[in-house]
């Protein structure tokens, strides 16, 4: 991702900024498209992961749909070229204003998360003399002892409709004349790398599909949600997720009926590896107990490490040639003569103790002005940035 030319280019640019490798993004999208096309699967990009216009432009150019979670995302998706017939709208708290935006835009469907929401969408559609297509988001409520997907799938989660409410759902769907039932929707969590979890999801989807069919509903769409994870530890050697194995699980374990569509809502897997947060060292504080590298980026630019204790690889690009992790043992012995490897807490400038990207990171001895990259920052990075401390809005730089 960072050749010498790119690193010298960074030296001329004010930091911090997000760097997007658009070539890698396209390769990732291509890999996903090829793997999903093989089975005729439909992918909606979960644009909450990143709605940078250049990212949206690339994603939509491959013909993916958009999975939106606000009225603004619906409007932005369509304004950026996504086909409205491939836009879905999820979220536990859709406001009337947002539902109206989506009705006016004639999107493909609402992923509905409560019985009350079904009634509201029906009323608003009726007022416009329209029919709203709806899919029911089901909370799988799976016992953690037998299945792995506990992240969003239990009764105490706010997401989705619990199975004990499904009779109400069926009744409401029958009585609401301005709703058209298209299918069932699930989303069990994010950063899932164990394919066994998806196998368990398939079993649950099959059961739910049967439940609806037994009651006379035709399930045209099976929407499995998103969640495919990426390798945060190896952003160079494992930068494109294994889409083939992922889709194959669904091909093998879902009971797909003739004419039925299978939908996916991938966010992170499509965009995470294609960007890094680039920052400079402002100050180096060498202490008796701790050494601190104080960067000019902090939790305001990338909050995942602070909010979720998430690991994102940190590299000193200015001393990349000296980085022991990039070299063979003999090479690193030679370079260790020149450069020391030290442990640092890599922190930001924000007035919060939690503003720390990672503690005790082993790095080549680093100096004021060194350029750092925090890798795998393309998903839930730029979009979660804030202006706290009245920081400048974060800028973006793109590969040529
Ligand atoms: N569909 C639904 C209904 C979702 O709630 C999400 C993500 C996705 C699809 C896309 O999931 P993905 O493929 O990106 O895993 N900010 C957190 C992640 C929050 C995910 C929220 N929902 C993070 O930085 O790890």
Task: Annotate each predicted stretch with a short phrase.
Residues 56, 79, 99-104, 121-124, ...:
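Short acidic, glycine/serine/threonine-rich loops at helix termini
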Residues 4, 260-320, 338-400:
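Charged (often Lys/Glu-rich) extended helix/loop segments that serve as interaction or gating elements
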Residues 1-132, 171, 176-180, 210-217, ...:
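A charged N-terminal "starter" segment
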Residues 67-68, 111, 135, 185, ...:
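Conserved beta-strand positions in the central sheet of alpha/beta enzyme cores
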Residues 321-340:
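Arg/Gly-rich low-complexity intrinsically disordered repeat tracts
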Residues 51-54, 75-76, 143-144, 190-194, ...:
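Flexible loop/turn segments at secondary-structure boundaries
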Residues 141-283, 389:
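Active-site loop/helix belt of alpha/beta enzymes
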Residues 46, 133-139, 185-187, 223-225, ...:
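Short beta-strand segments
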């Amino acid at each position: 991702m960072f050749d010498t030319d790119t690193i010298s280019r960074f030296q001329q640019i004010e930091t911090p900024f997000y760097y997007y490798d658009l070539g890698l993004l396209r390769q990732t999208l291509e890999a996903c498209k090829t793997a999903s096309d093989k089975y005729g699967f439909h992918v909606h990009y979960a644009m909450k992961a990143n709605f940078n216009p250049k990212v949206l432009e690339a994603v939509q150019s491959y013909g993916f749909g958009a999975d939106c979670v606000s009225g603004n995302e619906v409007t932005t998706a369509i304004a950026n070229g996504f086909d409205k017939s491939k836009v879905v709208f999820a979220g536990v708290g859709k406001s009337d204003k947002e539902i109206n935006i989506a009705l006016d835009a004639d999107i493909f469907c609402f992923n509905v998360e409560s019985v009350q929401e079904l009634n509201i969408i029906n009323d608003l559609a009726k007022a416009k003399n329209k029919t709203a297509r709806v899919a029911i988001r089901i909370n799988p409520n799976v016992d953690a002892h037998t299945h792995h997907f506990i992240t969003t799938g239990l009764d105490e989660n706010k997401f989705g409709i619990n199975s004990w409410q499904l009779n109400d759902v069926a009744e409401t769907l029958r009585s609401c004349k301005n709703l058209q039932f298209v299918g069932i929707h699930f989303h069990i969590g994010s950063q899932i790398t164990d394919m066994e979890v998806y196998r368990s999801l398939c079993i649950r989807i099959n059961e739910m599909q049967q439940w609806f069919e037994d009651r006379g509903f035709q399930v045209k769409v099976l929407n499995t949600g998103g969640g495919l994870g990426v390798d945060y530890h190896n952003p160079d050697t494992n930068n494109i997720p294994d889409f083939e194995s992922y889709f194959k699980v669904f091909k093998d374990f879902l009971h797909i009926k003739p004419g039925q569509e299978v939908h996916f809502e991938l966010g992170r897997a499509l965009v995470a590896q294609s960007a890094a947060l680039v920052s400079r060292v402002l100050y180096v504080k060498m202490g008796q107990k701790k050494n601190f590298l104080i960067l000019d980026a902090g939790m305001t630019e990338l909050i995942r490490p602070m909010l979720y204790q998430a690991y994102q690889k940190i590299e000193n690009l200015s001393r990349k040639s000296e980085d022991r992790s990039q070299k063979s043992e003999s090479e690193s012995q030679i370079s260790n003569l020149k450069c020391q490897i030290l442990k640092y807490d890599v922190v930001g400038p924000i007035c919060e103790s939690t503003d720390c990207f990672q503690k005790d990171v082993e790095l080549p001895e680093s100096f004021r002005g060194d350029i750092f990259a925090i890798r795998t920052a393309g998903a839930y990075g730029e979009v979660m940035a804030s202006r706290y401390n009245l920081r400048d809005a974060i800028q973006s730089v793109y590969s040529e």
